C-alpha cells in the first residue's frame, strides 16, 4: 500500500497587532468602512455588518482619544448611512427603532457641528439627516394601525389628532433641516468668495513672473490652473473617509512608518452651492406636501405660506436658476469650464433645477387650495403653468442684421419637461391629485384629466425611463387604471371591465420588468416592495369583483406577510382605488 503523503503544515493566522496610536485606531475603522462600501451594491446586509463594526471601531477610538474629530465625523456619517440602507428590521436589535437611529445620527452630527461650526460638509450632512427625520415622521405608520396589533379601520377625532401631531413633528424636522442648510449656504458663499480672492491673487503673482515661472508652469500642466493639485469632486469629498492631520487625532503617530492621515479640502464651487440650494428647495417642497384636505388648516396658515414662498423665490432667483443658467454657458466661462461637466451632466442639472421649481409650485398650488386661498380653476391653471416649457434665462438679443428675434423653438435654453421621465411622472402625480379633488363636484372633468394628461404622461415616461425605474412606473399605471374605474360616469362604467383588465396587465408588468434586468441590492429592495404591492392589488381586484379569495391566499403563501397585505390594502383604500367595504371584508377574512 503506497505511503500517503503528509498533509502540508497548517499555517497559523497571525494575530493582528492591536492598535496603539490614534492613527492606528482610525486605520482599523476606515478599513472596515471601506469593506462595507465594497459590498454596498451587492450585499446590503454584509455591508451593514461592516458599517456596524466600523462604527464600533470609531467609538473605540473616541474612548481612547476623545478629541479625535475624524472618528467623530466618520461615526456620525455612518450612523446616517445605516438609516438609509434597505436593511430588514431583524438586522437591528429589537430595542433599536428607525426613529431612534435617525435621532442618534442627528445628535452625532449636532455634536460635530458644535465642535467645528464652519464646515460646509458637516452642515450639509446634518441638514440631510434632519430632512430624513422629517420624511420618517411624514410616512410613519400610526401606532396600532397594523391588523395584528389590534388595529383596524381607524377614524374619529383621536386619529386626526395623532395625524396632526405626526405631521407637526415632520414639519419641525424639515424646518430644522432648512435652517441648517441655510447656514451651510452662508459658509459655502464665504468659502467661495475666499477661493476667488485667492485665485485672483495667485493669478496676479503668476502673471508678473519671469521666464523661470513660465517654465514652472510647463512642469505643472497636470495641476489645476489656479496652482493647486487636482482635487476630488464634491461628492467624493462628502463621502470621503480620509481623516485630517494627525496632530488633530489626539495622539502621536507612533513611528516614522505609521499611516499618516490628511484631509484634502476642495474649494467650494458654484456647483456645490447649487446642490445645497436644490436641497433647500426640496425641503420646502416636502413641507408643503404634508398638507391634506383634513389637516392643512391645522399645520399651515396664510402667513406661513407667504413666508415660505418668499424664501423659495430667494433660493430660486439668487442661486438655483442663475447658477444652472451659467452651466449652460460653460464653454464661454472659464470659471464654469473648470467644473469639468460633460454636456449630458449640464443638461441633467438644468432639468433638475427646472423640475425643482415646478414641484415647489405644484405643491404650493395644492396647499393654497386646501387652505381656501384659491379655487379649483386656479389650482389647475397653476399646475398647467408649472409644467409649461421653461427658460432658465432670457434668450439672447437678436442680431443687428435681423429685425426679428430668434424663434423660441430654436432656442436651446428652453427646458421641455416632457423630455424627462421624472418630470412626466411628477406631472401625472400632480394632475392625479388635482383630479381627486375635482371628482366629487365634477367627475367628468376628473375623468378627462386622468385620461388625457395623467395616463399619457406615464405612458411616455415608460418609454424614457431606465429599466430599473420601470417597475415603479408600471405600478403607478395600474393604480391609475383602478382610480379611473371608480369614477361615476358612463365612460368609466361601460369600460370598467377593460380598465380592471388593464390594471392587472400593468401589475403583472411590475413583476415582469423587475426580473428583466440586473438590479443592484439597494434598488432591489425597493423593487421587491413594488412587486409585493402589485401582486396584492391584482389579487384584491379578483376578490372585490369576483369574490375569489384564492389569489390573495396564494400571495400570502408566497411569502408576503399579513402586515404587508394589510398595509397595501389600507393605503389603496385611502387613495380611493379600493372601497372601504373591501377593507372590512379583508380584515374579517384575515382575522378568521
Where are these regions (language model features)?
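Short coil/linker segments at helix-helix boundaries
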Residues: 35-53, 81-111, 132-265, 287-311, ...
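N-terminal interaction modules that seed assembly of large macromolecular complexes
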Residues: 49-57, 70, 74
